C-alpha cells in the first residue's frame, strides 16, 4: 500500500514537472519503529480505563523539501501484536470480538488532508481501515523536536485521535467497555 502511494507521489511529481511548471520537491521520512508507538485507551465500567499499545509496523511522512510540516502521512499498525500487558485480555482484544487480528492483522491510516492550525500544529484528516472497514478520522498533530543523528535527521510527530469502535463492528461488551477509543501516536521519523 505504501509502495503504491509512493509510486503515485513519484508519478504526480514527474507529471507536474513535465508541464513546464517547477517540479515538486518532497522529503520522505520513515518511522524508526523502535522509537515510535501508538497507545490506545478506552473507558472500562465507566470508572476506569484500559490502556494498551499497538506497534507501528511502518510509517511514512512526506514533507516539502526543507520543511517539517507533513502533507502526507501513512501508518500501518500491527494489530496482531496489540498488548495491554494482560495475556487474557490481550487474547480477547485480538479475537473476533474486537480487532479480529487473525483475519485483519494490520490497521491502516492514510491521510487525505493536512491543515495547519498553528506554527507547529496541524489537523491530519484521513481514513482509518481496520477489520475491513474504512472510516474517516482526524488527528490533532504537533511537531516535536528535530535533531541530527550522525548523517540522519530525526523529527518527532505527536498526534491524538478518537474513533468509535462500534463503527468498525466491535460491538461486544458495549455496556462494560466504552465505545470511544483514544489513540495517542508518537512517530519518530528519520530522513
Question: What spans do the regions from the language model cover?
Answer:
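Bacterial N-terminal signal peptides that target proteins for export
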Residues: 1-10
Amino acid at each position: 500500500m505504501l509502495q503504491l502511494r509512493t509510486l503515485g507521489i513519484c508519478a504526480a511529481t514527474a507529471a507536474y514537472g513535465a508541464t513546464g511548471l517547477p517540479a515538486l520537491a518532497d522529503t520522505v521520512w520513515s518511522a524508526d519503529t523502535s522509537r515510535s508507538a501508538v497507545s490506545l485507551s478506552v473507558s472500562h465500567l465507566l470508572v476506569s480505563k484500559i490502556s494498551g499499545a499497538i506497534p507501528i509496523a511502518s510509517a511514512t511522512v512526506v514533507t516539502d523539501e526543507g520543511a517539517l510540516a507533513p502533507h502526507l502521512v501513512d501508518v500501518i499498525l500491527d494489530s496482531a501484536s496489540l498488548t495491554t500487558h494482560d495475556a487474557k485480555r490481550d487474547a480477547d482484544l485480538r479475537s473476533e470480538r474486537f480487532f479480529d487480528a487473525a483475519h485483519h492483522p494490520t490497521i491502516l491510516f492514510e491521510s487525505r488532508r493536512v491543515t495547519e492550525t498553528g506554527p507547529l500544529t496541524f489537523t491530519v484528516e484521513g481514513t482509518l481501515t481496520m477489520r475491513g472497514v474504512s472510516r474517516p478520522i482526524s488527528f490533532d498533530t504537533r511537531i516535536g523536536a528535530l535533531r541530527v543523528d550522525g548523517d540522519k535527521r530525526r523529527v518527532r510527530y505527536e498526534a491524538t485521535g478518537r474513533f468509535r469502535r462500534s463503527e468498525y463492528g466491535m460491538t461486544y461488551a458495549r455496556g462494560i467497555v466504552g465505545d470511544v477509543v483514544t489513540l495517542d501516536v508518537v512517530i519518530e521519523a528519520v530522513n
